[in-house]
UniProtKB/Swiss-Prot annotation:
FAD binds at residues 14-19, 126, 181, 377. Gene3D superfamilies: FAD/NAD(P)-binding domain (3.50.50.60), GidA associated domain, C-terminal subdomain (1.10.150.570), tRNA uridine 5-carboxymethylaminomethyl modification enzyme MnmG/GidA (1.10.10.1800). This is tRNA uridine 5-carboxymethylaminomethyl modification enzyme MnmG. Homodimer. Heterotetramer of two MnmE and two MnmG subunits. Its main location: cytoplasm. NAD(+) binds at residues 280-294. It holds the Pfam family GIDA. One of its GO terms (cellular component) is cytosol. It comes from Aquifex aeolicus (strain VF5). One of its GO terms (molecular function) is flavin adenine dinucleotide binding. Its cofactor is FAD. The keyword Secreted does not apply. GO terms for biological process: tRNA methylation; tRNA wobble uridine modification.
């Protein structure tokens, strides 16, 4: 009989980005929580690129922050370069991104977990989940001991039956140099969960001292830089002050020689040599994948990103590969600035087990077993931010399950986390899932600037934001509404096309005026608080478009039964992405509703289809 060591409300398996947010959320809600890890020193490890955020991803980090999560605070404290992406486009598609000091990020997260009340770190491998009457009751570890629990969150990342590929070399592991987890796959087979194989990869790490930086383009950070957490100083803002010290990244490009080396050795890669059967991420392809799929492209952009302030390692973003190591050296040295580069760690691909997310409710609890939750790469997603967003929801709902309370659901119209979870649990995945703003039909509303306004109420209700924090948000919200009403009530005369017309000050925001313009040209006061000022301007600009978006979404729902002609030529439809065309040709949906439920078919694709069919203007 196994020895029962302890009893927990929630057990989290894994200490990556999903596991951290799940464990912290559950513990902060008052659940006695255990985090089981293979190595307590790698909690929060960045397996691939040393960065947080990106298109849509940065918005997710701010949503996690609004729910009381940790990722935003961690990157604000350990980031070494900060940028706002898509600044040439509207606010609705802008997102923050930051380079991280990888070692400091990991140390920060480990310290937070170690000091969190109700959270206990266990360096043991969970090899089995104990179930009675379709309800989780405990876990069993590789040491043969058992822990009782009411809920389990599985966040194994790439570690479940992970296999690393470098050329024709196959190495069992969850990350290069680290063991994989094996026992849990047997548990899932025993309970008839389908298991599929997905694949991802990472580039080599380069010795900074062997790079010729004079041959590279400099890519600096923004000034002022954006921050991720509303609670990082200065509190109540999404911006750092000007003058924050940052490091540079650099840009280089592949060459025809690079492409020749890759083509000559394609048969030696794990992917094209037939060793890897798992499906890789469409939007983060290996360099060999790019060369095959875009044969006419003369060069591919590469970002060289420092891995930290106290290391010589450089991450070459855009050069992941599973080529043999000797070919990797030749390939990297064919790139300007890298002619004499030395590789510290080789690039590799990794294949791992995934349970299809259609096995889950939108709460991230499995349909087969009560109290069993999944989050992160194990659900078929790719990316730290996607993992963390699922992790905080799974952790919250695991704690609520342990307390016998109703779960939470995040809706598509209130968060990108809600968009992601809805996509995963209703459409499933045929390849690793990555978030983009185009996946949301509500992107004019669920922006990076208003995450705290959208989700702070829920964060407070769950006990993950303090009363003081929520009070500040409500005060700012009242200020925003007060200024909006004021500007809507004030009218000014403006010359347009030779005519002078009267407009409300609010309407001017939709005509590319700023509040500073209003102050300078018409003498109106503007809000002193920087966040209030920014938010008033953005909300007034977007309000009419958000209403139009809402009406369009209502119309789209009514058009779901529209028939699609069997002989339709998807190549002739303007506005469809390559992925959308491929998926529509493959699945041949007979109605627009069926098309909308295919993995990878975005609301934008459905709109383009309906316009082509003459159902929308």
């Amino acid at each position: 009989m196994a020895w029962v060591v302890d009893e927990f409300d929630v057990v989290v398996i894994g200490g990556g980005h999903a596991g951290i947010e799940a464990a912290l959320a559950a513990a902060r809600m008052g659940a006695k929580t255990a985090m089981f890890v293979l190595n307590a020193d790698t909690i929060g490890q960045m397996s691939c690129n040393p960065a947080i955020g990106g298109i849509a991803k940065g918005i997710v980090v701010r949503e996690i922050d609004a729910l009381g999560g940790e990722m935003g605070k961690a990157i604000d404290q350990t980031g070494i370069q900060f940028k706002m992406l898509n600044t040439r486009k509207g606010k609705a598609v802008q997102s923050p991104r930051a380079q991280a000091d990888k070692k400091r990020y990991r140390e920060y997260m480990k310290k937070v977990c170690e000091n969190q009340e109700n959270l206990y770190i266990k360096q043991e491998e969970v090899v089995d989940i104990i179930v009675k009457n379709n309800q989780v009751v405990g876990v069993r570890t590789n040491l043969g001991v058992e822990y009782k629990t009411k809920a389990v969150v599985v966040t194994t990342g790439t570690f479940l039956n992970g296999v690393i590929y470098i050329g024709d070399k196959m190495i069992p592991g969850g990350r290069l140099g680290e063991p994989r987890s094996e026992g849990l796959s047997d548990f899932y087979r025993r309970f008839d969960f389908p298991l599929i194989r997905f694949k991802t990869g990472t580039p080599a790490r380069l010795d900074k001292r062997t790079i010729d930086f004079s041959a590279l383009e400099v890519a600096p950070g923004d000034d002022p830089p954006p921050k991720f957490s509303f609670w990082t100083e200065p509190v109540g803002s999404y911006w750092f002050p000007k003058g924050k010290e940052q490091v540079n990244c650099w840009i280089t490009y592949t060459t025809p020689k690079t492409h020749e080396i890759i083509r000559k050795n394609l048969h030696r890669t794990a992917l094209y040599g037939g060793l890897i059967k798992g499906i890789g991420p469409r939007y983060c392809p290996s360099i060999e994948d790019k060369i095959v799929k875009f044969p006419d492209k003369e060069r591919h952009q590469i970002f060289l990103e420092p891995e930290g302030l106290d290391t010589i390692e450089i991450y070459p973003n855009g050069l992941s590969t599973s080529l043999p190591e000797e070919v990797q050296w030749e390939m990297y040295r064919s790139i300007p600035g890298l002619e004499n580069v030395v590789l510290i760690r080789p690039a590799y691909a990794i294949e791992y087990d995934v349970v299809p997310p259609t096995e889950l409710y939108p709460t991230l609890e499995t349909k087969k077993i009560r109290g069993l939750f999944h989050a992160g790469n194990f659900n078929g997603t790719t990316g730290y931010e996607e993992a963390a967003g699922q992790g905080i929801v799974a952790g919250i709902n695991a704690a609520l399950r342990a307390f016998g309370k109703e779960p939470i659901y995040l809706r598509r119209d209130e968060s990108y986390i809600g968009v992601m979870i809805d996509d995963l649990t209703t459409k499933g995945v045929t390849e690793p899932y990555r978030l983009f703003t185009s996946r949301s039909e509500y992107r004019l509303y669920i922006r990076q600037d208003n995450a705290i306004l959208r989700l702070a109420k829920l964060g407070r209700e769950l006990g993950l934001l303090s009363e003081e924090q929520y009070k500040l948000v409500k005060e700012l919200e009242r200020e925003i509404e007060k200024w909006k009403e004021f500007y809507k009530s004030e009218r000014v005369s403006v010359a347009v096309g030779g005519d002078t017309r009267s407009y409300s000050v609010a309407t001017l925001m939709t005509m590319n005026y700023t509040l500073d313009d209003v102050k300078e040209k018409f003498g109106y006061e503007v809000p002193q608080h920087p966040y209030v000022k920014e938010e008033v301007e953005i909300q007034l600009k977007y309000e009419p478009y958000i209403e139009r978006e809402r009406k369009l979404n209502e119309k789209l729902k009514k058009l779901e039964d529209t028939k699609i002609p069997p002989d339709i030529d998807y190549d002739k439809i303007p506005g469809l992405t390559k992925e959308a065309r491929e998926k529509l040709k493959k699945f041949k949906p007979i109605t627009v509703g069926q098309a909308s439920r295919i993995d990878g078919i975005t609301p934008a694709a459905i709109t383009a289809l309906l316009v082509y069919l003459g159902k929308l203007d």
